Amino acid sequence: MLQPKRRKYRKEQKGRNTGKATRGNAVSFGEFGLKAMGRGRLTARQIESARRAMTRHIKRGGRIWIRIFPDKPISKKPAEVRMGNGKGNPEYYVAEIQPGKMLYEMDGVSEELAREAFRLAAAKLPIATNFVVRQVGT
């Protein structure tokens, strides 16, 4: 699963996920893309689960790019532990997603195959997504 190799600090504050994606919002590598329409957090497990669904559907054809990376640690206290005594340990990593962010890209397959693969992947994700095709000249 995806997670950072090293971090300057193990724990991070919660923060707020606001605004729209200004970078990483266009199809840059492949011919087709899966774009986020809503905002939220995608865990490393969800990103990997969607990738597997797409890979299995397109079989040996095509190429997939993952345009997001889970770099934010989410900490959690153990079960039945009293409040206080500091912040819990990092449990998993998430990618903060804003509307307009390109999640995955695909190339080397037909549009019908790509559309179906992205539909299967979108079912694994907790945010609304759209299928997009690369614009001519970009």
UniProtKB/Swiss-Prot annotation:
Transmembrane helix in keyword set: no
Its Gene Ontology molecular function terms?
rRNA binding; structural constituent of ribosome; tRNA binding
> Mind listing the GO biological process terms from this record?
translation
Q: Which Gene Ontology terms of cellular component type are present?
A: cytosolic large ribosomal subunit
**Stretches for region Disordered:** 1-24
Could you list the residue ranges forming a coiled coil in this record? none
Where is this chain compositionally biased, Basic residues type?
1-13
Q: Which CDD domains match?
A: Ribosomal_L16_L10e (cd01433)
Q: Which UniProt keywords apply?
A: Ribonucleoprotein, Ribosomal protein, RNA-binding, rRNA-binding, tRNA-binding
Q: Which InterPro entries match?
A: Ribosomal_uL16, Ribosomal_uL16_bact-type, Ribosomal_uL16_CS, Ribosomal_uL16_dom, Ribosomal_uL16_sf
Summarize subunit and interaction data from the UniProt record for this chain. Answer: Part of the 50S ribosomal subunit.
Q: Which family does it belong to?
A: Belongs to the universal ribosomal protein uL16 family.
What this protein is reported to do is described as:
Binds 23S rRNA and is also seen to make contacts with the A and possibly P site tRNAs.
Q: What is this protein called?
A: Large ribosomal subunit protein uL16
Q: Which organism is it from?
A: Cupriavidus metallidurans (strain ATCC 43123 / DSM 2839 / NBRC 102507 / CH34)
Gene name linked to the record: rplP
